[in-house]
């Protein structure tokens, strides 16, 4: 019985088990429909046809024998814009589109009207159309002719000067420049100030032979009197004009009644630029040699270049008789009290005439400048009588507080032996200590001995 049994049931079991395993390995996704059942929503990725998938046996790409050419799809008009430069006109445009179209048409119609109105009001001819190239080449000849307005000549250019006047002014300037070049810098300043005066003032100054007293000015700007001369022997006291000389005339005619009245002595400081601008050519009177005390720098009146053959005590006849304009006027010693303010010590305030003349005769290059001196004073006494008078020398000292004290030094005269005796009687120790080097004096002694105030000057001038 056992042999008669069919072994097929065991084989069937194995086949079933294999099929179950294959089913388990398969993906869980949807299965493809049978070939008879097609879904038009599906599209084949290989051929791009609808109704089957790429793995379907109906795909023509898998079975080329049954492959068919896919039919061409019909064109849909309006889908593609074949002429994009032409706007599409809608059949029923909206209200907004209508307004835009009307606004575009209005300015086109108004353009010719505006042009006509502009031609009427402006009066210009209507614009002509541009000519062709042939016409332009022919009309270019007419464009070369200048049709613009003539240039207007303005007065910005300087007027033309007459050549005769120009030559005359050039010669005058050259002569003036050569004359100034031969003079010292101090005299250049005086000549430049005198040249700034008008012709009328020069004539009045030339006609006046009267000695001019110093004028007292009350104001912030100091004024110094300058008398320009061509010959300046030693002893003449001159000052450099500064900023005040630009506004006031220096040469003024004084009535003869002013001769009897003695003018007040003025002592006014100058701007410091005057002393710094002095070169080596200017004559300055100092102590013996180049020695001077450090704390009290001494500066006397400025002396202009003098004639080499004039002696220290010779007086030209022009000075005695009055002479021409510019003749040197010598300061006369006042009676008794010849110093301003309190009397100074004879050791520091007096110098012998020989010492003064020896200092003045020194060459210009051996005289050092005074950069520390910041002011200069001027004392002017008009000559009452020129008979036998000798020039005076004014000695200036600078104090601690910035003030300046002045003292008069009279030169001995051979014609009047009385005055030198009086002068030597007042200062007996001058001749003895003139050759001895100066002793350094403390500043407090100088301040006590040499302090001069404006009140003391006024009182001394009134007494004299």
UniProtKB/Swiss-Prot annotation:
It comes from the Eukaryota. Residues 1-42, 70-293, 312-390, 410-442 are annotated as: Disordered. InterPro entries: FAM90, Znf-CCHC_6. Transmembrane segments: none annotated. Residues 178-197 have a biased composition (Low complexity). Residues 74-83, 97-114 have a biased composition (Basic and acidic residues). Belongs to the FAM90 family. This is Protein FAM90A26. The gene is FAM90A26.
